[in-house]
Amino acid sequence: MSGLLCYCRQGFEPELAAELSARAAFVGIAGYARTQRNDGYVLFVCDEAAQLAAKLQWRELIFARQKLVVIAELKGIDPKDRITPILAALEGQQRFGDLWVEHPDSDAGKPLASLARSFGNALRPALRKAGLLTDKPQPRQPRLHICFLDGDHALLAVADSADSAPWPLGIPRLKLLPEAPSRSALKLDEALLTLLTPEEREALVKPGMRAADLGAAPGGWTWVLTRQHVHVTSVDNGPLRAHVLETGLVEHLRADGFHWKPAQPLDWMVCDMVEQPRRVAERMATWVREGWCRNTIFNLKLPMKKRWDETRLCLELFEQQAEKSLIVRAKQLYHDREEITVLAMRG
């Protein structure tokens, strides 16, 4: 068995399968996607998995929460002895720097959570005894993933820690603080964690910067920016939560976010308005093209059908109309629903 294992939001397997197929074809690697709706993962079977993984950077994949290279598929595992076949399948492999035992984030996969936790505790000492796992986690070495699809069915895969999600299942466990104006705050928190590298976050999100939040009410995204000590112009005809205004970092303008423009260039513009995705993409492109902002994070609400086609169309439309040299990344975040979050920054 050789291929890529990618986790995704349950119900978005067709979109991830289409994305992997299109991207693999673009780089000239043949393969096919194996999945079923609501599995919570896609297995892209190909003979050149390592080469494909190197060309498809995790941060560049839209619908993949995690990207792993499969090294074995085990079926019919004896529940009384799962360790022996796993050790046999790993014979000759290099020493791994960490072990994550996982399951798909799906209705069928979640009941396997307790098995994953307990089995990980049993497998670690066996791997160390066999010389397959370091005594302490070593993030610079490849990470071993055991993904249980059922009690007797598992995929063994490896991750490059520099090119994979740093969270089990690819899900950052963010806590919604009581003072957050809305749950949408988690979207921007996750976007900053996922779409930017630590070095980019440090360089691009600094105290004293200026930003606009279009369609800001009740203030979730504005609040996230103020916690980074960014000055925010919040544009919305609706009200903001009082404690957001009390930060002293927020100017609330009662205006239509689709028509407002700043008097001077801003460091950031963020937008989570509920609107047709193509209309949003065009307006965001105008902001970049006119130089109204240097960097932007915005959401695109996807239709129920042909979501991969709409995603590609909107991103192409944005990049064409922006008329700038940009680094563009997009993800369907864990805290997103029927939408994707897009980052665009000056190249």
UniProtKB/Swiss-Prot annotation:
GO CC terms of this entry: cytoplasm
Record's subcellular location: Cytoplasm
EC class: transferase
Major localization class: cytoplasm
Annotated catalysed reactions: cytidine(2498) in 23S rRNA + S-adenosyl-L-methionine = 2'-O-methylcytidine(2498) in 23S rRNA + S-adenosyl-L-homocysteine + H(+)
Gene Ontology MF, one: S-adenosylmethionine-dependent methyltransferase activity
Binding-site residues, S-adenosyl-L-methionine: S184, A217, P218, G219, G220, D236, D256, D272
Disulfide-linked positions: none
Coiled coil spans: none
EC number: 2.1.1.186
PANTHER family on file: RIBOSOMAL RNA LARGE SUBUNIT METHYLTRANSFERASE M, RIBOSOMAL RNA METHYLTRANSFERASE FTSJ DOMAIN-CONTAINING PROTEIN
Subunit structure: Monomer.
Function: Catalyzes the 2'-O-methylation at nucleotide C2498 in 23S rRNA.
Name of the protein described by the UniProt record: Ribosomal RNA large subunit methyltransferase M
Native organism: Xanthomonas oryzae pv. oryzae (strain MAFF 311018)
Lineage: Bacteria, Pseudomonadati, Pseudomonadota, Gammaproteobacteria, Lysobacterales
